[in-house]
Structures are given as C-alpha cells and as structure tokens.
Amino acid sequence: MRLKRMHIRYYPPGIFLDYEKGGQLRTKCIDLLNLTPETDVEELVLEIRAAEPLITSSCVEQVKLLICKLQEKVGQKDERKFYLFRALQAHILPLTNVAFNKSGSCFITGSYDRTCKIWDTASGEELHTLEGHRNVVYAIAFNNPYGDKVATGSFDKTCKLWSAETGKCFYTFRGHTAEIVCLAFNPQSTLVATGSMDTTAKLWDVESGEEVSTLAGHFAEIISLCFNTTGDRLVTGSFDHTAILWDVPSGRKVHVLSGHRGEISCVQFNWDCSLIATASLDKSCKVWDAEGGQCLATLLGHNDEVLDVCFNYTGQLIATASADGTSRVFSTDTFQCLCQLEGHKGEISKVCFNAQGSRVLTASVDKTSRVWCVKTGACLQVLEGHSDEIFSCAFNYEGDTIITGSKDNTCRIWH
C-alpha cells in the first residue's frame, strides 16, 4: 500500500487518503467527528498514526496542517444574516418539496402541477422543466454528492430518473400500485429507493432501470426512508407505527423497530451509521442502535405530533420539529434536550441543520422560516414574505444560501 495524496472534507470533518494497492487506486477516510478548535493536534496525530498504517512519519506535518485547516473551519464564527435574493413564481400549483445539489449551485422544486423544475441558485433562472408525470410530483432528490441525476416520485405510482444537465428522462420505474411519497439515492448513486402508499419500498438500478428488489414487511403506507452513508442499509418508516431496517444487497429485513404508539413521520441515519432516529405522531422521537435494533432513548417534551427529525453532520445532535410549534435540539451522547426553539405561531413541518452544525432552520405553517442558534436556542432571524404556509426548507452545503418552498406556489432564495 502506498499513499498517493491526502485531501480534506469540511463537513463532517475528515481526511481522505488516496492510496495504491495492487495497482489500483483506492480511497479511505479518517472521520474526525469530534474535532473542535480546542482539540490537541499533536495528540490527535499520534492517535491517527497508531490506527492508520498509511500515515508514516514523512507525512505527519501535512496531516497536522490539514487538521489545523479543519479546526479553522469548525471554529469559524457565523454572524451572517440572510436576505431575500429572489422570489420565484416557481409553479402554477403549490410546491411539494425543494432540494439542493451538493454544491448548492442548483436546486429542484416538485409541484402539484405534475412537474419538477431545476433552478440555477446564483441567478434564480429556470434551467429545466421535467415533464412527463401524470399526477402530483411529490418526492424529489438529487444523486448527491454527484448531482448529475434527479429522481422524482409521483402520485401516478411511478418514479422517473432524469439527467440534471439536459433534463432528459432516462427511465420510468413502474411497479408500485399506489402513490410514491418518498425516495432516496444510495450514496454511490447506483440505486434509487422508493417508498409508497402500497406499503412497500422498492430498489431500482440506476444504470439499467431495472427493479432490484421489493421490500415488503410493513402493514401500512411507507412515508419516509433513508440510506446509511455506506449504502448497505436502508431504513423505512411507516404508518403501521414501525420502522424497518433492511439489508440492501439481499433485500432482507434486519430489524423491526417497534415501540412507537403512533404513525412514523420521519426516519434518519446518523453519519457513522450507528444510530437511527424515528419521529412519530405519538409526540415522541426515538433513537435506536442501528446494529442491534434496540431503542436507546425516547426523546420526550413535545405536546403534539413530531413531524420531522434530523441529525447534524457529525451525528452528535438531533433536532425535532413538532405540530406544537416548537423545535428541540437533543444530544446523542446524553439524549438530554439542550435547547427548545420557541417562537413559531403554528406547526413546524421541517427542520434541518446547516453543515457546520451551528444553526437550525425551521419551516412553519405560520408562513415564516426561522434561523436559530444551536448553542443558545435563540431565534437569530425570521424569514418573512411567503403568503401561505412553508412546508420545506434547506441550507446549501456551505450554509450561505437557504431555499424555502411554500403553498403560495413560490420558492424563495435567501443569501
């Protein structure tokens, strides 16, 4: 094995090692999820050297430099305020979802008008309209980190795969017998998973357009699904009050996560694939051990349905969004509530962290989106201007752009 090159990933912090083995170029990553500005660099380098044979004495100084660069980024102060850059009359009927590509240079909007549109973030220009569905386009996703393909899931029971560059439709995936309401690409961008009101999830091959497997095991609609970062596991959340963990290569059930007393609204993996979070209409969120399937904690405190849940990039924090009009941030170490985000005047349907993990963004039926400080729980900014409820919001990877999607048929870009 011979080390060829090292490069870094900012969020979550990590160092990539490109190396040669048996004449082939390979890559491995050293995750530095606990890195802070206070981390002792010398000590960390010693730990890395002890654990990683590719790191020899000749490259220790470079490793130190890379860690210092990551520390600088992690410790960056984030004082920015967001301003409305563009309000886009995106669709003739209400939007269903919005999503960024990895770099944030483009984003997509799905709509009741049966189309998905691709937009240029910098100019607000429409790049492509993806037409062909015969009903509402409900679930949409880029194949991040690549960003060259888009998948759309529709109430017409099909999923379509498109070129993000040309807007051309590669494949239409047929097989579900009811509406498709959630979908995701695996991290390798070789598979698309779709979840449907027909109680099944399906895996589709991106290259051939063929169905790979049907994941049958739920007794009610599948409303949410998520791949882990290695792509070998998929979790599905259902109205049958359970989540199921699946082995992707075999299509077999690994664990049934049962314990909620109401429908599941959202399921998420953390970055290192060790935890799964489930949000439920039973007013709670549960955290599960992804390996053994045990429930590690029930996160309580909301007095109405929990509608969304997400991890920050390092997997150390969980944010919840509830119909009670509040959001909460919990520690994955202690499972204690660190702060309560209060200020919205109606249910919060969406919550997300910026990549740095310093901010939380929420979308609410009160027609506003809010930016919150994770450390203090203070509301830093109210993004106003939509004339109807906001159901979707997203940060780009750099954390300097926000998109909000509303039932007023518009999408807003905030810089």
Curated annotation (Swiss-Prot):
Required for axonemal dynein assembly and ciliary motility in ciliated organs, including Kupffer's vesicle, during embryogenesis. Facilitates the onset of robust cilia motility during development. Disulfide bonds: none annotated. Its main location: cytoplasm. WD repeats lie at residues 90-129, 132-172, 175-214, 217-256, 259-298, 301-340, 343-384, 385-415. Disruption phenotype: Defects are the cause of a phenotype related to primary ciliary dyskinesia (PCD). Embryos have curly tails, pronephric cysts and left-right asymmetry defects. Expressed in organs bearing motile cilia, including the pronephros, otic vesicles and Kupffer's vesicle. Keywords: Cell projection, Cilium, Cytoplasm, Cytoskeleton, Flagellum, Repeat, WD repeat. GO terms for cellular component: ciliary basal body; cilium; cytoplasm; motile cilium; SCF ubiquitin ligase complex. InterPro entries: G-protein_beta_WD-40_rep, WD40/YVTN_repeat-like_dom_sf, WD40_repeat_CS, WD40_repeat_dom_sf, WD40_rpt. The lineage of its organism: Eukaryota, Metazoa, Chordata, Craniata, Vertebrata. Belongs to the WD repeat WDR69 family. It is found in: Cytoplasm, Cytoskeleton, Flagellum basal body; Cytoplasm, Cytoskeleton, Flagellum axoneme. GO terms for molecular function: ubiquitin-like ligase-substrate adaptor activity. It comes from the Eukaryota. One of its GO terms (biological process) is determination of heart left/right asymmetry. This is Dynein assembly factor with WD repeat domains 1.
